[in-house]
Design a protein with these regions (language model features):
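Beta-strand-enriched cores of mature, soluble protein domains
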Residues: 68-70, 107, 133-141
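A short hydrophobic beta-strand segment most commonly corresponding to one strand
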Residues: 98, 112-129
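A glycine-rich, hydrophobic/aromatic-adjacent loop/helix-cap motif
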Residues: 18-25, 123, 135-142
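Short, conserved beta-strand element in jelly-roll/cupin
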Residues: 66-81
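Short acidic-glycine-tyrosine-enriched beta hairpin
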Residues: 83-106
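Conserved short histidine dyad/triad with adjacent acidic residue
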Residues: 49-67, 101-102
Length: 143
């Protein structure tokens, strides 16, 4: 009911699995429904935002990604597999994850599920290094 209300008032965005700069953007498909609880367009000076993410598909490709800000994820429904440099872990409903802006990770879903998370993004500008790495081997740091 809350998600339908947020959609009705213009607080829903369908996020594709790759952006317009990707060489295969023409193959893009819905990856996540994002619902904005506070700001649809957060000002850079504001220290946080609160969103609901309904995941529709695994992270794109074989790579890992990070975020431009530290963040907290609380899994509300479903669950997913998260790959970190320390291994692959099942994240069940109720899991609370704290991530730095530099934390490379990957999310994969169980087939037929649409996990729902509360996502709290922190201040911008704290990431050092690249946005994503494709084909990374966490153990050797080689492609």
């Amino acid at each position: 009911m809350l998600l339908k209300f947020l959609e009705k008032i213009g607080r829903k965005k369908v996020v594709l699995d790759r952006g317009p700069s990707h060489p295969k953007f023409h193959e893009a498909k819905p990856w996540m429904n994002r619902y904005y609880l506070i700001f649809r367009h957060r000002p850079k000076w504001f220290p946080f935002n609160i969103l609901i993410h309904e995941k529709l598909a695994d992270d794109h490709g074989e790579g890992v990604h990070n975020h431009t800000f530290p963040n907290i994820t609380i899994i509300l429904r479903g669950g997913y597999w998260e790959t970190l440099s320390t291994g692959k872990f099942w994240r069940p409903p109720g899991y609370i994850g704290f991530r730095s802006a530099n934390n490379l990770h990957r999310v994969d879903l169980k087939p037929g599920t649409k996990p729902l998370t509360l996502f709290i993004s922190g201040p911008f500008g704290l990431r050092k290094g690249p946005r994503s790495e494709y084909g990374i081997d966490f153990k050797s740091k080689k492609n």
